[in-house]
């Protein structure tokens, strides 16, 4: 019995995507070109990278249903994604892309069987481990998004914005302190 299945995977992904969209909404469009360092993605580029980041696992697991990665044209696929990331977009277009791509991926996750999630996929020769379950591989997009969302939260701080999750935590602590003081 699996206690964390497709519905939980989809719900967790939706939560992560909702928080990413909130960050995108809170950063003013004039700061979408901000880069923490010259050799990093801008805020806007990072948000688009996150938005289209689900296309790789979708191709592997939902379109091709690959059992092995050998023979997959990773560089060809990556070049298409990279071109997509470079297309100019407004803040609203980026937020819409995040929403649409995120919901499409979450819906695909939601309907997966436990059997499908348990299937092993052989990775590229020489990789360690040599294979992973689809479940582990499909956790990857959420982990990838959280990695880049942390970068966006640092950018928010550099731009003078307190991230919404930090504000929410501060509000909870303040409420607990106020309640403790009344006792």
Language model features: what each stretch is:
Residues 40-42, 125:
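Short acidic/glycine-enriched loop/turn segments that link adjacent beta-strands
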Residues 1-8, 52-130, 159-183:
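Short, helix-capping/interhelical loops that line the mouth of catalytic, cofactor-
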Residues 27-28:
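Membrane-proximal, proline-rich intrinsically disordered regions
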Residues 13-20, 43-58, 88, 95-105, ...:
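Alpha-helical transition-metal enzyme core signature, strongest for iron centers
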Residues 134-136:
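Short alpha-helical transmembrane interface motifs in multi-pass membrane proteins
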């Amino acid at each position: 019995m699996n206690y964390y299945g497709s519905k939980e995977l989809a719900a967790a992904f939706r939560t992560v995507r909702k928080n990413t969209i909130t960050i995108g909404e809170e950063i003013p469009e004039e700061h979408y070109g901000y880069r923490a360092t010259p050799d990093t993605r801008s805020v806007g580029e990072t948000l688009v990278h996150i938005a289209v980041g689900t296309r790789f696992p979708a191709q592997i697991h939902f379109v091709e249903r690959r059992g092995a990665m050998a023979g997959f044209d990773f560089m060809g696929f990556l070049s298409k994604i990279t071109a997509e990331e470079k297309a100019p977009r407004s803040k609203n277009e980026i937020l819409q892309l995040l929403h649409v791509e995120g919901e499409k991926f979450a819906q695909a996750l939601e309907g997966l069987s436990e059997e499908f999630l348990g299937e092993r996929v052989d990775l590229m020769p020489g990789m360690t481990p040599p294979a992973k379950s689809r479940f582990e591989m499909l956790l990857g997009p959420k982990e990838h998004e959280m990695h880049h969302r942390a970068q966006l939260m640092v950018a928010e701080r550099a731009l003078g914005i307190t991230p919404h999750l930090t504000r929410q935590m501060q509000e909870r602590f303040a409420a607990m302190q106020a309640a403790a003081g009344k006792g």
